[in-house]
């Protein structure tokens, strides 16, 4: 969690202490059925199974399936035992109870967003000096392929950040996991989805929490404010939000932080906080170099995306002509796929959002392509909000 309002003043962590962030290492989800969740990402989104731990590897209380597409890695973890049985497994008792509590409170969701760093000790010690809440101290895990150092701190809600140093490891994922090489049987019948890496990871906060959380990222991890919009920029007839993008010192890791703003009805941020029962990760943006192929193939695999109205493209065509911007991609193809467009004088952004991945309207995925554009689609926020409000109306939560 972010520090309380009456916490002592923290001194910003110094970039010299923080070394370089290398990017997102992985995103760790707690889910009710990890095997089935992994199958969703494999069949619907073109991920591949890369590692596993469970009963067959000696893990008697929890199972984890690791899937990957490009440099995007998800760990999906589920409990194998009930809370009542937890005491039978002292090594995993605390973890087992934590997973059950997380699932009861939030449903399936992101527990940890892990960053790869050059030196765990430097980043972690700087964070601790500046008031980070420690979940686990620096520890080393090893096997015949070497060792990985890691440490974990808390961020907003019950979400955590694990710092990972991989320089001493040559294995495919992490000690304690069995590597998987079997190709899913459906892959030969389905089009390939080429994704590159995680572009950003968005956290939703409750009312008036955004500034406090952003301050926490600044002072604990040395992040800076990269981009922001307020409720005057992002609003519809019914709802609004505020957003600040926090970035690592070298701008490789970006963590947008959202909060609701006053509107006539419940916004998507309020809906998220209500159903997730607190702050947490709202969506993960996955970067691709060819969004037309990616969306075409994701839709062919059955991934569901939001619908964009015809009027959006009528307006966009006028805006592009006024700007004198010519897209590399065919406009009618983008329109047929519901791909959103944003631009400035330097370049443009193409993006589209899936529908929620779970029955609870909480987490979803963004597919994004950047063409010399470092923004976050502010020009599309209204269209996105209106699309989500149509879904909210169907759920009866636009109240």
UniProtKB/Swiss-Prot annotation:
It comes from the Eukaryota. Keywords: Dioxygenase, Iron, Metal-binding, Oxidoreductase, Phenylalanine catabolism, Repeat, Tyrosine catabolism. Pathway: Amino-acid degradation; L-phenylalanine degradation; acetoacetate and fumarate from L-phenylalanine: step 3/6. InterPro entries: 4OHPhenylPyrv_dOase (IPR005956), 4OHPhenylPyrv_dOase_C (IPR041735), 4OHPhenylPyrv_dOase_N (IPR041736), Glyas_Bleomycin-R_OHBP_Dase (IPR029068), Glyas_Fos-R_dOase_dom (IPR004360), VOC (IPR037523). Fe cation binds at residues 200, 283, 366. It is an enzyme of class 1 (oxidoreductase). Residues 23-166, 197-355 form the VOC domain. Its cofactor is Fe cation. Binds 1 Fe cation per subunit. It holds the Pfam family Glyoxalase. CDD domains: HPPD_C_like (cd07250), HPPD_N_like (cd08342). It catalyses: 3-(4-hydroxyphenyl)pyruvate + O2 = homogentisate + CO2. GO terms for molecular function: 4-hydroxyphenylpyruvate dioxygenase activity; metal ion binding. Its EC number is 1.13.11.27. GO terms for biological process: L-phenylalanine catabolic process; tyrosine catabolic process. The keyword Oxidoreductase applies. NCBIfam families: 4HPPD (TIGR01263). Belongs to the 4HPPD family. This is 4-hydroxyphenylpyruvate dioxygenase. It comes from Coccidioides immitis (strain RS) (Valley fever fungus).
